[in-house]
Structure formats: structure tokens, C-alpha cells
Regions:
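Catalytic cores and adjacent flexible loops of soluble metabolic enzymes
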Residues: 1-229
Length: 229
């Protein structure tokens, strides 16, 4: 009894096999190495119509090992849009770069070959990972996934403290009550705490209604309109 059934790239054109596997009602994963759009579409239709419990596709390059320039990972979001199923990567490349890029493009699962000892040889030894390498690979890919987050703007929790390091309008020399605010006595400097820098044209020509020391933040209560001294 297995939790899911994997159809390798070389079997994607065997529609009777796919239909039989799908009829077992288990989740299915189909690799798409070498396959045309029509061949992938036929495989998806066969799996769905035969009762696959759930279906995912894997973008795959069946070159052993796969060259980075031939992996065409931009196909991943295209496949998601075309067949409306989860898409991952069957990774036959060397190293973690392709898998990390795939995750950044929306891949939801990654298949990687494992060998207990690469020196033992075999047809997939060149791009297989040993156990300690697999652990590092998983950590690397998960770290990339964690950086994706969600679509949001504004300061994050850790950025809130950094807001204080923004610029604001401050006195850059002593200002006496009644002085006009000018570009010479007020400028945009760090830290925050004063009026926003984009208000500099608005405040220039206004009158200080109290004395300000060099470095003091400029706020609305410090100002009167021009002519009110």
C-alpha cells in the first residue's frame, strides 16, 4: 500500500498505465520530461477521468544530468495556469540552484535523487545527493521558500524600529522665535521625529513660534503662517 503513485517521464505517453494507476484513487504525480503540451494534456485528462485522488505535475528535464540552461523553469507557472494543478520540479541538475529557483517560481514540491554513496556509481550518481547533502539541500530550499512570504507593504515587525532612522525636518542651526523657516535653518536629516521631508517647501516661509536648538525636530506646533510673528 503506497500513499501516492509516481509516473516517470518515460511513461507519460503510456495512457493505459496512467488510467490504471489513477483508478486506484490515490494521489498521482506525473513527471513531464521530454513531453509536449499535447502529451501532458493527454496524461492529465487520462488521470482525471480515471479517478486520480489528486494530481500534481513535475517540470522535468530528462537529461542526466540536466544542464541549467535547458531546464526552462519559467514553464512552472505556465503549467500551473494551463492545467490548474500543483506543479513541482523533478530535479536532475547538480546542486540546489535549480530547486531554489523553482520554488521561487511557485513549485510546491521537489523530487531529488538520493544515493547512499556517490562513489558506488550508477546512471544517476552524478546528480544524486548523499544523505548529509540532502539535509543541506532541504534546508536551503526551505529557506528560499520562507523568503517568499506574502504580498504586503509597510514595515515588518523587525522594521518598525528602523522607521526611527528615517529622515525628518530638523533645525540645522539655532532658530529664534519669530525667525522665518528657510532652507538654511531647516533641512531633512536623520533621525525621524519631525515633519516629513516632503513638507520642506510648505514650511519654508513660515515663522517659528518658539526657539529651536540645532537638531530639534520641526513639528506643526512650532510654526505660524508667514506674517504671524
Amino acid at each position: 500500500d503506497v500513499p501516492a503513485i509516481k509516473i516517470a517521464s518515460f511513461e507519460i505517453i503510456d495512457l493505459p498505465l496512467i488510467s490504471y494507476a489513477a483508478a486506484q484513487g490515490r494521489p498521482m504525480i506525473i513527471s513531464t520530461g521530454m513531453a509536449t503540451v499535447a502529451e501532458i494534456d493527454n496524461a492529465v485528462r487520462a488521470a482525471v477521468s480515471s479517478g486520480a485522488g489528486a494530481l500534481a505535475l513535475l517540470r522535468c528535464n530528462s537529461g542526466y544530468p540536466a544542464e541549467p540552461g535547458e531546464m526552462d523553469l519559467h514553464s512552472i507557472p505556465a503549467m500551473q495556469a494551463m492545467w490548474n494543478v500543483p506543479v513541482g520540479l523533478s530535479d536532475h541538475s547538480v546542486g540546489p540552484s535549480a530547486a531554489s529557483a523553482a520554488v521561487a517560481l511557485g513549485a510546491v514540491l521537489v523530487e531529488k535523487h538520493l544515493t547512499l554513496r556517490r562513489a558506488n556509481g550508477g546512471p544517476d550518481a552524478a546528480f544524486s545527493l548523499e544523505p548529509d547533502e540532502l539535509s543541506e539541500f532541504v534546508s536551503s530550499v526551505r529557506e528560499v521558500h520562507s523568503t517568499l512570504g506574502s504580498v504586503r507593504f509597510g514595515p515588518s515587525k523587525r522594521e518598525v524600529a528602523s522607521v526611527a532612522l528615517r529622515r525628518s525636518l530638523r533645525a540645522v542651526k539655532p532658530i529664534t522665535q519669530g525667525d522665518l523657516i528657510t532652507m538654511e535653518n531647516v533641512r531633512s536629516v536623520r533621525p525621524a521625529g519631525g515633519l516629513a521631508p516632503d513638507l520642506i517647501d510648505t514650511v519654508c516661509g513660515m515663522v517659528a513660534c518658539r526657539a529651536l536648538d540645532q537638531g530639534d525636530p520641526l513639528v506643526w506646533s512650532d510654526l505660524n503662517p508667514a506674517g504671524m510673528r
